[in-house]
Swiss-Prot record:
It is found in: Cytoplasm. HAMAP family: GTPase_Obg. GO terms for biological process: ribosome biogenesis. Belongs to the TRAFAC class OBG-HflX-like GTPase superfamily. OBG GTPase family. GTP binds at residues 166-173, 191-195, 213-216, 284-287, 315-317. Residues 160-334 form the OBG-type G domain. This is GTPase Obg. The gene is obg. Its EC number is 3.6.5.-.
Amino acid sequence: MKFIDEARIEVIAGDGGNGSASMRREKFVPFGGPDGGDGGRGGSVWAVADRNINTLIDYRFAKKHLARNGENGRGSDCYGAAGEDITLRLPVGTAIYDADTDEQIADLTLDGQRLCLARGGEGGWGNIHFKSSTNRAPRQKTDGKPGERRNLRLELKVLADVGLLGMPNAGKSTLITAISNARPKIADYPFTTLHPNLGVVRTGPSKSFVVADIPGLIEGAAEGAGLGHQFLRHLQRTRVLLHVVDLAPFDEGIDPVAEAKAIVGELKKYDAELYDKPRWLVLNKLDMVPEDEREARVKDFIKRFKWKGPVHRISALTHDGCPGLIHAIQDYLDTLRAEEEAAAAAPDARLDPTLHNVDHDGSANA
């Protein structure tokens, strides 16, 4: 299935049914009074996050989603039936924006998360509500209220622990194939990857993490060149970025350091928070470098790139260095999760009784 990560839709909730102005007409009941029922509520439009869906392609073509109107009220105290709700199933990781104001309405990050996109209109009142001691035969009724109507923009940001970042043909697809169950298209020309790929990396019976391989970036990606905006946003939810660098480009005129600096520059221009995200350097295609030149080439790259963070030397093609890389990632993610759990379990200082001079028996100290 083709990966679609943005769509625009219109959601229209159902209108409420009109109330009825009816009088009871029955044999032997000369003054039956009002018996007009209320109109039914209009159907609402809901969204629910579904982990079994991974693309917005259905909403690229089905742009208008309408819920049913409520039925009108009738005589004999018959209330109109409510309009049926409709539910739009969206991938986990979908952000929902108002297309007219660009305001974010919701971010569906949990499977089963549910949200009302457009609420149905309330049904109108029948004339039974207007009966009083001075108005025994009311003719008043109210019409149903219109349902909400919204233009929405759906934006999918993939949920992954690790994001692969790099120039086209840096070997990112080969790397995700080597370490995970993903099988993206691989070829010896740039821009082979045209949409994000997700792969699950298993490091033990109950340990795993998710890697996202986005299409290669080019200079100007932060301004949208090469669909850069669509690709960079998929890295925003990751915990760590792997900057994959081709250390043995076919074109000798290409400088890996200059390309790596260009990628970092695009990150900084696109989003400061993304730029500050933990980033590891992965020097790839070492199998293409003569063995006696590898150490010197690696040191030269690190020196000119002025890199002080973690460095991993690998060959995605031969899998050399890949086991060490994935176990280092798993250890890092485990440490992050342990710190988050410890922070969540820490007692709130505002609830510490010693700060308020309260004894354990509940009495206050002098």
